[in-house]
Amino acid sequence: MHDKILILDFGSQVTQLIARRVREAHVYCEIHPNDVSDEFVREFAPKAVILSGSHASTYEDHQLRAPQAVWDLGVPVLGICYGMQTMAVQLGGKVEWSDHREFGYAEMRAHGHTRLLDGIEDFTTAEGHGMLKVWMSHGDKVAELPPGFALMASTPSCPIAGMADEARGYYAVQFHPEVTHTVKGRQIIERFVLQIAGAKPDWIMSNHIEEAVAKIREQVGDEEVILGLSGGVDSSVAAALIHRAIGDQLTCVFVDHGLLRLNEGKMVLDMFEGRLHAKVVHVDASEQFLGHLTGVTDPEAKRKIIGREFVEVFQAEAQKLSKAKWLAQGTIYPDVVESGGTKTKKATTIKSHHNVGGLPETLGLKLLEPLRDLFKDEVRELGVALGLPPEMVYRHPFPGPGLGVRILGEVKREYADLLRRADAIFIEELRGTTATAQDAAAGLCGEADVGKTWYDLTSQAFAVFLPVKSVGVMGDGRTYDYVTSLRAVQTTDFMTAHWAHLPYALLGRASNRIINEVRGINRVVYDISGKPPATIEWE
């Protein structure tokens, strides 16, 4: 029986990141709405409780509160951002509007040598004060500590940036330790979960396989399952896991929607029919997809259309299988989060994912999502534990809508052909270039990264087609052709990301090759936007 951490979600877009950090400490956790009943909290029997952030304010008429049972259990509690504010209000403190809102990077001073922050610092001031580099996102602030609490941290704009009641094991921070921008955030959460809560670190993917297989068998019984196979990491691992559970009851449906990467169809069929010996049905539906996308420019509309057409194709294939009752998908946590689909339904929608946004209520198949509660690196760990080859497991993620969300505006076959060739060149250059000692000296990578390919050093890389033309010169002639943008990011969780600082020589080779080898493109740019404020995909 795993020790469990209960994460109460107040509607933050990054609540799942809290879960990711807890799981990185190999401790099992679950996310549930903040308004669960006292009985639920008691029956859950958590080793500790974490209160998430929120876009809401403690001043709103319908204030979000933690159940009273949280304070009656006698277990450690960690409040984050809004979670700190509701802890303060519920336990007798005071919260007020802040004249100096904080959104972004801040330097925070630790006070009092509490168990949570003791010995954790990024640098020390001349006066000897330990300082932390943190990420803030708040408009309200705690103005008065609740009884029994002591000051734990502060910033110039937020005098009470952290508070602690060590006797009861209550800790709260105004910053977000779950995001990668908080340098020591992972260490802080591990400290809370492992040392303060005393949870056992026994949550590992090799153990998860047995539980997941048993759950799939219980759900499916003797019914048949169809799965949309894209060749990406998520659908591949989902297919392997389901195949492990029910064997030939699974039929993989590979749909060529005309928006795949270069030579992807052949690679997918060779991989799954040849290596996994799974049943694969190949459906060429490119005319169907591209036809419905004609004239459509809105990103959400494109995603919904692609999702809808996937469902229609799957339904058509399901009718050919007498026992097909289930549609399996490789949906993972970030898909659900970016669709505003947390269990509370309070998160603000950023974009809909094809796996969750395009399914009509009248879908004739039941939905099987065995990876829904896992993050990307957990999915990769699961794939390795299932025996999948590294080239499959560590391939960069590819969106379900394919190149449809990497072509800005209207999708045309001409645009897709140009983009897939440009994308292939960029990926080829990343795979063929290794990091050097000079790259490390320039701060582009760490010393331990020397010798690794830049493909392995980036988490996701791709080209984007821009439907605008620019003037160029080739030979003695004037050109007027399209523009493509290269995008490469580094991230541990895909919830936040930094743009990859690639060597100029690599970018130069990729640009020169694209312009010379892809007729129709005469300008290449590089995207240096982080997430936030930008998303990883352009649409």
Swiss-Prot record:
Enzyme class, broadest EC rank: ligase
EC number(s) reported in the record: 6.3.5.2
GO cellular component: cytosol
Gene3D superfamilies per the UniProt record, alphabetical: 3.30.300.10, 3.40.50.880, HUPs
Record: active site: C81 (nucleophile), H176, E178
Functional pathway: Purine metabolism; GMP biosynthesis; GMP from XMP (L-Gln route): step 1/1
UniProt keyword Lipid metabolism present: no
Superkingdom, taxonomy of origin: Bacteria
Keywords, sorted A to Z: ATP-binding, Glutamine amidotransferase, GMP biosynthesis, Ligase, Nucleotide-binding, Purine biosynthesis
Domain annotation Glutamine amidotransferase type-1: ranges: 4-202
Binding site for ATP: S230, G231, G232, V233, D234, S235, S236
Pfam families in the record: GATase, GMP_synt_C, NAD_synthase
Entry keyword annotation includes Ribonucleoprotein: no
Chain ranges of the GMPS ATP-PPase domain: 203-395
An example molecular function term from Gene Ontology annotations: GMP synthase activity
InterPro entries tied to this protein: Class_I_gatase-like, GATASE, GMP_synth_C, GMP_synth_GATase, GMP_synthase, GMPS_ATP_PPase_dom, NAD/GMP_synthase, Rossmann-like_a/b/a_fold
Reaction equation(s) it catalyzes: XMP + L-glutamine + ATP + H2O = GMP + L-glutamate + AMP + diphosphate + 2 H(+)
Subunit structure: Homodimer.
Main function: Catalyzes the synthesis of GMP from XMP.
Name this protein carries in UniProt: GMP synthase [glutamine-hydrolyzing]
